[in-house]
Amino acid sequence: MRKWRIEDSAELYNINGWGLKYFSINDKGHVAVTPREGSASVDLKELMDELQVRDVTSPVLLRFPDILDNRIEKISKCFQQAADEYGYTAKNFIIYPIKVNQMRQVVEEIVSHGKKFNIGLEAGSKPELHAVLAINTDENSLIICNGYKDENYVELALLAQKMGRRIFLVVEKLNELRLIADISKRLKIRPNIGIRIKLASSGSGKWEESGGDGSKFGLNSSELLEALDFLEKAKMTDCLKLIHFHIGSQITKIRRIKNALKEASQFYVQLQNMGFHVEFVDIGGGLGVDYDGTRSSSSESSMNYSIQEYVNDSVSALVDACAKNNLPQPNIITESGRSLTAHHSVLVFEVLETTSLPIWDEKEELGENPHELVDELYKIWDNMNQPRLLESWHDALQIREEALDLFGLGLLDLSLIHISEPTRLQLI
């Protein structure tokens, strides 16, 4: 049998599937990182050797800021391409939820490089809002406030808005709307209000239950009507500027996204027809990362669509709904934090110990009068070739089962099981 090659490692670990050209195996058999296509690669083995010379030992977390920059550009270009294709004339805003990765260096890099791509930040609590206000000083950048809201959280957001920040308070419970109305009246400010709508559509994958009718957050249809009635009575209809939905993280099936977008588009149409001039539709997170490189929906670690397909469906759904109802196109907000940051860091740690499967020594002979099952298994291994590989594997499995049955009945010695095991494993 031939020796193991670099190509075999690339195929085994499917690095070309999940690496997205950021990660590859170089000619030395080492993992290489290429932050941008066409730029210089970093050999991780050589990098770690250099760090050890400097007395830096593993575990080490390596960050590649250029990958963050490239991911921002990738998503932005996908929206531009979709806008050109479907006639989308409004704006797209990319929002980074800092809960995804709160490391200062990460958030600063995203804010710095993302200025020309309408990058904003999302806060899910008062402490996160403090961090967002401190790190993102661009007055044209959007700040989305989600999560549980108490009086202090709402007051901080409204005071920041009074200072010129573009802040949107997204209502997830009816009592939050009343709280926002009371505090804004006291501070004499017209708040930018968003409403999170609880869609019937749900996502797919590990976080499927976080969306749909069973979701903990958002207003259902009856609660939405109650909220709209409250805004009308409070003469705050002009304050409702955003609707938001989120059907789960790491969505594996594009069909679920299509259904949610279709449903959300109708909510936008209905609100416009009721006299609420919503300017933004926040489609939330959910854009998946293909961790295993299979590009399938059968695994929670993958998804069956590309970023471009996700963006195309998002843009086309809203453009189509607006065209049919003669309505202005809304600005689209996305909160795809996972897709932005997943590839940019690598954790390198020391391998403490390894285990290996027993392998048949090619120089070893079976000896005289071997058991017929062992002899047959040896012949399968000795005569194995590529065209009959699967057939040989099936034959080996059958012999293995027969050997275990005989061993269980006391008709086969442990020594024979010992001989047959490395021969079978060699076939793998």
Question: Where on the chain are the PLM-derived regions?
Answer:
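N-terminal basic/disordered segments at the start of proteins
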Residues: 2-37
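Low-complexity, highly charged intrinsically disordered N-terminal segments
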Residues: 26-39, 45-102
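Phosphate/diphosphate-binding loops
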Residues: 172-175, 307-318, 331-334, 370-374
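Short glycine/threonine-rich loop-to-helix capping motif typified by GTGT followed
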Residues: 251-259, 290-307, 339-354
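Polar, glycine-rich mid-to-C-terminal structural blocks
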Residues: 340, 349-410
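Single conserved hydrophobic/aromatic residue that forms the stacking wall/gate
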Residues: 417-428
